A protein has these predicted regions:
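A short core secondary-structure module
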Residues: 148, 153-199
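Amphipathic, small/basic residue-rich leader segments at the start of a protein or domain
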Residues: 1-91, 111, 115, 272, ...
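C-terminal helix-coil-helix/basic helical segment that borders enzyme active sites and/or dimer interfaces
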Residues: 31-37, 282, 294, 298-347
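A short, Trp-centered hydrophobic/proline-enriched beta-strand micro-motif
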Residues: 119-127
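A structural signal for short hydrophobic beta-strand segments in well-ordered beta-sheet cores
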Residues: 141-144
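Glycine-rich beta->alpha junctions and the first turn(s) of the following alpha-helix
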Residues: 4-8, 197-307, 363
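Internal helix-loop-helix
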Residues: 51-119, 160-167, 304, 308-315, ...
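Glycine-rich phosphate/cofactor-binding loops in nucleotide/flavin-utilizing enzymes
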Residues: 2-5, 71, 75-76, 95, ...
Length: 391
């Protein structure tokens, strides 16, 4: 891999400056404060501004379709991340829109895609069920055909951003007696349909997600994505992308690991801790003068660097595990003030370690638990076969 610095062309340099100015104008302190308070990872005005300026369309489209070049895509994504822009759910919308275009009816794509690219239409995922855990193929939400429509009943957990979305990419069971993975069908269900109830819940890290209930929800067959009982085929590409097991592009400008944006959160917490331990107390002593602090901070930095440099699904496990381990070390180093959250008087490092500690636990669950990913690595990468669970 070539690690040399990329020299930007005058045009790309201008794009870099324009993007930074745009983000500075729209991602204000008030936007970030609201995001911390409500945990939605979404701001409608910012999202609409990104759409109006053409950023969403350029990010979604391939370069051959008029989208960003690899260099501009990297510039855009890095600057969006560095500013803590609350747009995490754009990734979900982008992936679902691509699947809709690939597997859905052209009429549906023509109706939905323009709104996606303008920012007016957002999409969310309806996979996980209350009793299903990480195995989405155990789906019990039923879709029963009734002429040209389908009647849907069931419930889904962790449907993040449903409160801001127009449609949910919903996994249903259309043949309960059929073989696993061959009885699933996908729909793009309008969330304003009668019979849908969205109930917000707050997670440990302060984010909002949702339980969504479906009671005799009628959906036209137009909204079916892919073949009847062919839902697993539709889902596979989305899951592979989420899990980080797709082949990387050869330009080398994409994120190294899956969920690498969480590595940035860890890096900022480590940087703030490193600055805090250099401060003197009233007696002129610094935490950094303690050899154990030097050792533990140095170890945290080394582990963080290793985790963010680990590729693909391996990095997904490395990041989640390292966040859990490093956050505990940082809170020990910073002492009692480390339990005070961001924007609290006298918090250590502005609460970055406290947030990392809370954020680390669900990070090991998003998109599948660490145990699921370790099994995937063992089975698919190391060729060790399927796990054999006792009992």
């Amino acid at each position: 891999m070539d690690f040399s610095r990329i020299d930007l062309s005058p045009e790309d340099q201008a794009f870099y400056q324009e993007t930074r100015a745009f983000i500075a104008e729209h991602v204000t302190d008030d936007v970030l404060r609201r995001d911390r308070e409500f945990g939605e990872n979404f701001d409608e005005q910012v999202h609409l501004a990104l759409g109006k300026a053409g950023y969403l369309a350029s990010d979604w489209k391939l370069e051959s379709e008029g989208g960003f070049s690899p260099v501009r895509r990297r510039i855009f994504q890095l600057e969006i991340g560095r500013a803590h822009t609350p747009w995490y759910h754009w990734g979900t919308t982008s992936v679902v829109a691509r699947l809709m275009q690939q597997f859905g009816e052209p009429e549906l794509t023509d109706a939905v895609l323009p709104g996606v690219l303008s920012g007016e239409i957002r999409l969310c995922l309806g996979y996980t069920e209350p009793e299903g855990g990480s195995d989405v193929a155990t789906c019990k939400t039923r879709a029963v055909r009734d002429g040209d429509t389908w009647i849907i009943n069931g419930s889904k957990m962790f449907t993040s951003n449903a409160q801001n979305a127009k449609y949910v990419f919903l996994l249903t069971n259309t043949e309960p007696q059929g073989p696993k993975h061959k009885n699933l069908t996908m729909f793009l269900v309008p969330l304003d349909s009668p019979g849908i109830e969205i109930q917000g819940i707050r997670t440990l890290d302060g984010d909002r997600t949702n339980i969504v209930y479906y009671s005799d929800v009628r959906v036209d067959d137009l909204y079916r994505i892919g073949d009847v009982n062919g839902g697993w085929t539709v889902m596979r590409s989305a899951l592979d992308s989420e899990h980080g097991i797709v082949d990387p592009d050869d330009h080398g400008l994409q994120n190294i690991s899956a969920m690498s944006e969480h590595g940035r959160v860890m890096a900022e917490a480590v940087d703030k801790a490193a600055a805090w331990v250099t401060l003197q107390d009233p007696d002129g002593r610094r935490p950094l003068d303690d050899d154990s602090v030097k050792y533990r901070l140095g170890r945290s930095i080394a582990r963080m660097e290793a985790a963010v440099s680990t590729p693909g699904m391996y990095g997904r496990v490395a990041l989640a595990q390292t966040m859990r381990d490093v956050s505990s070390d940082l809170m020990d180093i910073l002492g009692a003030a480390s339990v005070l959250p961001t924007d609290t008087k006298d918090s250590a490092g502005d609460g970055a370690a406290e947030y990392l500690f809370r954020h680390a636990l669900p990070t090991g669950i998003y998109g599948g638990t660490m145990e699921v990913f370790r099994n995937m690595i063992a089975e698919h990468a190391l060729k060790l076969g399927r796990p054999d669970y006792p009992g």
